[in-house]
């Protein structure tokens, strides 16, 4: 199923999300196609809705190179780990945790095989979904140092927020007994 077909099933109470997704994926000008579709994929995976993720991967396979698709999946995977670890060290009152060695492998951050700024952008989007302020700050700083504008960064965050919200709606609709999710 394509994303458009899946989005058509979103109920009327989430019409704003449908419209936002359409405009963010079809009318935005701040991001390259790779940046946009990598953000959609990484955000879908981070949002943990199987139907949305399946549709996003299917649509993105046409938009991204195999290497780009793999890198977007890698960004979601590594940030799934890092966001928990660094959110803990950031939020814990005991400051010693932040000084202890991480001892977690993160090689994919340097070996993903695509443009570094695109990978950083996807990591920032996933970090926003997962609520890790330390990771958001770290990746946003790299993006700004590499010449990304605030507008480009927030374009990816808009996509992440809408993808996450749509995934939540799909989860809620799936939990309803014998009701179909029609618009």
State each model region's role.
Residues 1-183:
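Hydrophobic alpha-helical segments
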